[in-house]
A protein has these predicted regions:
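Extracellular/periplasmic solute-recognition and catalytic clefts
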Residues: 1-57, 68, 76, 80-82
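Paired acidic/hydrophobic, glycine-rich loop segments that form the ligand-binding mouth/hinge
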Residues: 13-18, 202-207, 282
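Short, solvent-exposed loop/beta-turn-alpha elements that line the ligand-binding surface or hinge
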Residues: 27-46, 52-62, 97-125, 138-150, ...
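Solvent-exposed, polar/charged alpha-helical surfaces in well-ordered, non-transmembrane soluble domains
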Residues: 2-5, 9, 51, 63, ...
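Bilobed periplasmic-binding protein-like "clamshell/Venus-flytrap" ligand-binding domains
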Residues: 80, 133-158, 207, 255-294
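Short, solvent-exposed loop/turn and secondary-structure capping segments
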Residues: 6, 25-28, 80-85, 90-94, ...
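Periplasmic-binding protein-like
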Residues: 26, 56-104, 115-131, 271-282
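Ligand/substrate-recognition segments at binding pockets and active sites
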Residues: 1-9, 117-119, 135-211
Length: 332
């Protein structure tokens, strides 16, 4: 029996798993299941599963190639299909180094970033970007070349991670639409961990820090800090070995800055650099942990705006433990 089946049967009270089309459990099957938020995205999204390009791989060392792939991706399909609606869209919360929570969004100037954003699945814009860079298909095989070699890459994440697997298939389709061959590769988790942590990949997917007292700063390091580039084994971030001196200057300055306006300027500039250079590309917003409850035995679990301020941390982590004191037996 899978965890999902046990949860739906009522053998598990609280689940921390991704369930495709979660809302169908109560809308169609009429099960006593609820989430922290009643409406889509149903969860409190605080992390950003992200595409990383290996900038030491020929072709992917070119901004035009990385950005073209980023522009061509159908993010709405990622969110509606791969995530089955369990994420805000980038129209709702435009991409930046920030997660979609109100506290972090207040720390970035989204108006200043508007000119650097791209529309969803902008295939024609991506093609033009590549054409203008002289990266074209010269032999008619449907694949563009750079330095005489086809742009052909492998994108990987662990097998069995259904939402991530589906997301990379959408990325691969985006590549095909603009003349870049991207093949998906779904190894066992142990092999995937070895690949991304040692730089043995071309395109990979990883999820960064969520919400904590160390963020958004540590997430910015995760996205773009060159401090990790010389590590033989790196589980910390910037897996594609991106190098940008201005990024490093800002990251060195932030811990010493106390002025909120200046910090906002720094985080806005980091967002601008990420959007312009595309060393990595956030693909969706996602819960730090999933929080689904089956109320066949216990009820009164925490929900958004219920006045308790207990976070959706599965009743086990940090102040989330406080949820246990509010539970009531259904037949009590």
């Amino acid at each position: 029996m899978t965890v999902s089946t046990a949860f739906q049967n009522g053998d598990v009270d609280v689940a921390q798993i991704f369930i495709t089309d979660l809302q169908k459990l109560w809308l169609e099957q009429d099960l006593p299941i609820s989430t922290y938020v009643d409406e889509a995205p149903y969860q409190l999204c605080m992390t950003m599963p992200t595409l990383f390009f290996n900038t030491e791989v020929e072709g992917l060392d070119q901004v035009a190639v990385r950005k073209a792939i980023a522009m061509a991706v159908d993010y709405d399909q990622v969110i509606s299909s791969a995530m089955s609606g369990q994420s805000p869209t980038f129209a709702d919360v435009p991409r930046s180094v920030m997660n979609p929570t109100d506290g972090e969004q207040a720390m970035v100037d989204q108006d200043a970033l508007k000119e650097y954003q791209w529309s969803n699945a902008d295939v024609e814009g991506a093609k033009k970007l590549l054409d203008d860079a002289g990266i074209v298909d010269t032999d008619g095989d449907g694949i563009r070349e750079y330095n005489g070699k086809n742009l052909s890459y492998k994108a990987e994440c662990p097998t069995g991670w259904s939402d991530w697997n589906a997301t990379l298939e959408i990325v691969a389709a985006a590549g095909k639409n603009i003349g870049i061959n991207i093949e998906t590769y779904f190894p066992e988790a142990a092999n995937y961990n070895t690949d991304y942590s040692t730089g043995n990949f071309e395109i990979t997917m990883q999820s960064g820090p969520g919400t904590s007292v160390a963020n958004p700063y540590m997430r910015c390091r995760f996205f773009m800090s060159s401090d990790y580039n010389d590590l033989e084994v790196n589980f910390s971030g910037n897996f594609g070995h991106y190098q940008n001196d201005r990024v490093d200057e800002i990251l060195a300055a932030i811990p010493h800055e106390t002025d909120d306006a200046k910090l906002k300027d720094y985080y806005t500039e980091l967002s601008k650099i990420m959007l312009e250079d595309c060393p990595c590309v956030p693909l969706m917003y996602r819960p730090q942990v999933f929080h689904e409850v089956n109320e066949s035995v216990w009820t009164n679990y925490p929900q958004k705006d219920d006045g308790t301020n207990v976070p959706p941390m599965d009743c086990t982590d940090g102040y989330g433990v406080a949820a246990l004191y509010n539970l009531e037996l259904i037949d009590g």
